[in-house]
Amino acid sequence: MTTETNAQEAEQSAVPSAPRKSFGGRWTYGVIIMAFLFVLMPFLFWNATWFGRPLTDTQLGLALANRSHPREIQHALAQIEARMEAHDPGVRHWYPAVLALANDPVDEIRVTDAWVMGQDNTSQDFHHALVGLLTDSNVMVERNAALSLVRFGDDAGHAQIVAMLRPYTMASPLAGTLETRLKPSDVVNPGTLLAHVESPGGRKEVRATVPGTLERWLAQNGTAISAGQPLLSLQPSESMVWEALRALYLVGRAEDLPDVDRYARGGDGFSPQVAQQALAASRAIRSRATS
């Protein structure tokens, strides 16, 4: 750079830039309000769906009686579970309501209820209710009941637990023409839309009943299917496998070893912790078989 060039640059930098127009007070307040709403709305949604938000006894009673909002009942059940884990002596006041929900017509409520009843293995009323839920119309209710029964030292749900380690065949709930929506390797959760079935009565949805990964369709897209016909195969989710292996550590039998050892070898896209749990379950089963 020459001295002349430096002088020119200094002169240019000394020239004040043209003043920018202000947004004005209204625009400023508008931006602040919008920013606040962007923060507030996700919080309100989270606060309304997060089951960890504590409830007073009054709120708990109102939530359990809120038949128009099943998630409020689920929230109440989650709070009852938290009180059980904290060994709150007053939680037994809510046990009759928990027992009554075992017969609730809403599947999601029974799924949660079956899990919550397993948190107090001293309640024989819970024990009896869980045995009844092993034949529930919803497979997730059956599975949660089977896992909860293990806490009572009861392996009556052994078959349901072992099934959690295997692919799940989902049957069509109705007859009609199949319109598949997902492809193999897609991950699903209970409630995920899998397909539509076109019938004279209209276009109906088919949703997943268990979590997992779509292995393959057992019926072809565009073909006629009947109610009860095998529709697809789902590989089990990691959470299902993990819970089943934890249960089989306690109640597994020698005939379960082929299913357990498959996970002990690792793979299937699962975390190393699953293989470690499978190995622990395998050792526990072998120890019981030889003792």
Summary of predicted features, one role per range:
Residues S68-H69, P105-V106, S137-N138, T169, ...:
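Short inter-helical turns and helix N-cap capping residues of alpha-solenoid HEAT/ARM repeat scaffolds
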Residues W50-L64, E85-N103, N121-T135, D154-P167, ...:
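Amphipathic alpha-helical scaffolding segments comprising HEAT/armadillo-like alpha-solenoid repeats
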Residues V162-L178, L193-G212, S233-P236:
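Short beta-strand-turn/beta-hairpin segments enriched in glycine/proline and small hydrophobics
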Residues A76, D113, A145-A146, A244, ...:
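Conserved hydrophobic register position within alpha-solenoid helical repeats
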Residues M1-R20:
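N-terminal intrinsically disordered, acidic low-complexity segments at the extreme N-terminus
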Residues E81-A82, G118, V150, Y249, ...:
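Structural signature of alpha-helical solenoid repeat scaffolds
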Residues I73, R110, E142-R143, V241, ...:
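Residue-level detector of extended alpha-helical repeat arrays and alpha-solenoid scaffolds
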Residues E179-N189, W217-Q229:
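Acidic, glycine-anchored pre-beta loop/turn
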